[in-house]
Swiss-Prot record:
Protein's GO biological process: bidirectional double-stranded viral DNA replication; DNA replication
Organismal lineage: Viruses, Duplodnaviria, Heunggongvirae, Peploviricota, Herviviricetes
Site (Essential for primase activity): 628, 630
Zn finger residue spans: CHC2-type: 988-1028
Function as written in the Swiss-Prot or TrEMBL entry: Essential component of the helicase/primase complex. Unwinds the DNA at the replication forks and generates single-stranded DNA for both leading and lagging strand synthesis. The primase initiates primer synthesis and thereby produces large amount of short RNA primers on the lagging strand that the polymerase elongates using dNTPs.
Natural source organism: Human herpesvirus 1 (strain 17) (HHV-1)
Name of the featured protein: DNA primase
Enzyme Commission code(s) on record: 2.7.7.-
Amino acid sequence: MGQEDGNRGERRAAGTPVEVTALYATDGCVITSSIALLTNSLLGAEPVYIFSYDAYTHDGRADGPTEQDRFEESRALYQASGGLNGDSFRVTFCLLGTEVGGTHQARGRTRPMFVCRFERADDVAALQDALAHGTPLQPDHIAATLDAEATFALHANMILALTVAINNASPRTGRDAAAAQYDQGASLRSLVGRTSLGQRGLTTLYVHHEVRVLAAYRRAYYGSAQSPFWFLSKFGPDEKSLVLTTRYYLLQAQRLGGAGATYDLQAIKDICATYAIPHAPRPDTVSAASLTSFAAITRFCCTSQYARGAAAAGFPLYVERRIAADVRETSALEKFITHDRSCLRVSDREFITYIYLAHFECFSPPRLATHLRAVTTHDPNPAASTEQPSPLGREAVEQFFCHVRAQLNIGEYVKHNVTPRETVLDGDTAKAYLRARTYAPGALTPAPAYCGAVDSATKMMGRLADAEKLLVPRGWPAFAPASPGEDTAGGTPPPQTCGIVKRLLRLAATEQQGPTPPAIAALIRNAAVQTPLPVYRISMVPTGQAFAALAWDDWARITRDARLAEAVVSAEAAAHPDHGALGRRLTDRIRAQGPVMPPGGLDAGGQMYVNRNEIFNGALAITNIILDLDIALKEPVPFRRLHEALGHFRRGALAAVQLLFPAARVDPDAYPCYFFKSACRPGPASVGSGSGLGNDDDGDWFPCYDDAGDEEWAEDPGAMDTSHDPPDDEVAYFDLCHEVGPTAEPRETDSPVCSCTDKIGLRVCMPVPAPYVVHGSLTMRGVARVIQQAVLLDRDFVEAIGSYVKNFLLIDTGVYAHGHSLRLPYFAKIAPDGPACGRLLPVFVIPPACKDVPAFVAAHADPRRFHFHAPPTYLASPREIRVLHSLGGDYVSFFERKASRNALEHFGRRETLTEVLGRYNVQPDAGGTVEGFASELLGRIVACIETHFPEHAGEYQAVSVRRAVSKDDWVLLQLVPVRGTLQQSLSCLRFKHGRASRATARTFVALSVGANNRLCVSLCQQCFAAKCDSNRLHTLFTIDAGTPCSPSVPCSTSQPSS
């Protein structure tokens, strides 16, 4: 091998000189010394230290050399004892700096100062001594070998710029100053044509303008201020990193190009750490701490074994191999994410979680350690490299992406993420369960007039109180209604309170005991009623809420103007054998009839035929799967395309139903699925001001009645989980911009366009297949999410409507919380300025194998098809029922499950809120302790409000605390103005709303567990206006509760209410 290296050295000596790029320094100011050398003023020049260098040759080979050839050629440059092989050298001396001017390549990190040609024996010997042992080069050697032409070509632009700046030259025309004009075509070079740009020009400038010349060069060569300690701290501290990283990062990367030229310093140092080349101990005992001068650091680097031989020759090649291995393994991640971006139909928030999880799974510390062990080499020779194939990409696919692939198949998704739990009832037990847990058969049977209790919220509270007075002697619990802002500061805590909704739902679901009339008979004043009964919320005009519990109703009055005669349906079915065309034709006929809103009245009894929202009762069984679809749009959807998409939606939903209810017989080609869509608005002129659209509440917030509003949180706070679940917004905020369609009867070929521009509101109703019923809010929420997953995995659905949709969070699951409500089909919503709009009308999606089209069309108007708790058709004689009471598993989100597992594995267990509050001597289960603790923290919260929201600070001077939601890791407490104060409501802190009715907001203090298991106290608000996301909870600021032993904080202005 030595003979071969010698032959290569002889061939090189006869050819071109060895190219050397040297990073140098001096003991004093390197810029002053360098200019002295350039101007041939050797008295001001200092010896030059070369502490890092790069050597290469230009062989001019036409064929690209292999990696092994490059290694051998590079190793042949280095002498075993130090220095370089060769008889002549062209050395470019550099300092830290950047070349001026744009380029498509990576910018260099050094800037050349002068070029020298070492050809004479004594000069070459001096250079070899400097490279091998760190001996400083004397100024006379630099001056004797200076290549003036090449050197001053580097400085021509600098000399020219200095000449122009010093002489204030500018290109202009005109003989005097008054006539002078700027000449854009004039060349600056023509103005300084008599100025020498070589050594003479620089010398002249330096002699006459030394300060400006030094300042300019110091700005251009910002390496002039670097000290030995700077280089040691940046590129060290160990010997290998100091020598190899400095050489590659500053000198070799730009010359070699490739990805390495774009890597930052830390990345190169990380690569250097896996270049584990063995070497003998240094003969000296020099430590990094002793390298306090350039003489010491130069001697240390030049005598290092990493600066010569195979170790020096192999490192640049190893950087290329290591980068290629990293990119190869990580590109699998990029490819999967790119693929999933177009086919993994999840919400934006969930996809972001997926991206973070993918990177965490692939680049977790254990996997990275395995990868680094695989790519570590112990031999610089590429032919003998000890690197192994890295398992990083393969493990990422096996451990993460294979599970993600399972999300793209609904069967695998249910298999891995859903564990249904059901209870089987038969005979009399099944019959008794259905009678006790579904609406009484007469409740949804058409009748000439309604029977029930209907009244405004205020009057309903009084009627409930009167009914409860009759029931209390018979064992009914007493509830005292709480008025908004009730002041309890000066006395005993108030009696137990409960809102309208909870009391109504409890009355409506209570069974009849023997011959005694049911409890709700005391409210309805009719002993013949049977329970359970449906409970409704009604939006009044212009504002306010009403409530109803109905034993029966005149359903024909509600649906008669939006129904088709059986003869018409039969005729259309005979004329249009294609069910898709038939469904669109029948839908167009409904629209062409011009359904009008039933006349409403100022009283609740009339208004309930305009707007009605079924309140979900968590105590009852669910017999109809009612889905609330809110499709956010990029642009309007052609109706034909929308209708086709709904057909694909039906197919995907039924695929999920078959998997969730395996004991049921579900024929996907014949099973009924009913669709209703909010009527399109005819135009802005008919709807009112655009600012009013979208502000109506189709959900559960009762702005005028805090006790009713509190009921929204009473049973199932999970519906508004702002920490983990996707936002569950109510349908009213999305549907309000829709109105009744045109009256003209379009032809099928017209392909009408749905005029909804922002969102499409839909109801999808499917009977729970016999013999199943569903029980529980969480179970129903899980069913809806599995159905959404199945629909989004239907390729035809995504292709049909995907280009029109902004995001794929389609189904709102917040409606399945106890006490939440959902607008019924055939009813409208109430716009903020009063008129009813957006009536939900049928869209007929006829099953492919439907045998009786008229019956299917008529079933859309059957109230038993679109109520959550309607009595099933087999109620009279059920042989067996299966109660699905839990989906178990992690159906909520595969990505959330992975995130939770990773957090536990890598960051330790997060304490529960109960454990954290226990350190403050607060017991969440003990009455009033959490409220009292929050009251103590109010002083700090009010101080923040005074600082950041000074105009609202006065509203919080007299507030009390009332618990709203309690969870294992989250407690929400509402701030309520004390009764009797001037301010009886709290204003929105996020925005200034034009309308006073929109300025009112509910304000909460949230207690949660933050990082490092510390207690976090957040101020949150829920504002009704669309500008504030329509009742969505927003966190305004968060403070740290401090350590339990910290001094007590200022207390609030009143005692907490229970």
